[in-house]
């Protein structure tokens, strides 16, 4: 198991109150594969440096988790398939 930080930029048309529950649904693969979600930090709506899919803003969320590399690959794949996700970035923490 390794420590990861996942940054997700969501579509700004989503209601900010529903971002938390929808992230929990997206992160279900981590729990089913035996990983652990350490922290979910929702930064809220921010202006993007450049447009992504014709959007100038996005809702940022940062997730700290502990999981196997295969689980994180599957999470990144599923987030990429989700239409409400504009962009993801996965970083591995060395502790």
From Swiss-Prot:
KW rRNA-binding (keyword) present: yes
GO cellular component: cytoplasm; ribonucleoprotein complex; ribosome
CDD domains the UniProt entry points to: bS6
Disulfide bonds: none
A single MF term (Gene Ontology): small ribosomal subunit rRNA binding
Keyword entries, A-Z: Ribonucleoprotein, Ribosomal protein, RNA-binding, rRNA-binding
Any single biological process term in GO: translation
Record family assignment: Belongs to the bacterial ribosomal protein bS6 family.
Role of this protein: Binds together with bS18 to 16S ribosomal RNA.
Protein name (Swiss-Prot/TrEMBL): Small ribosomal subunit protein bS6
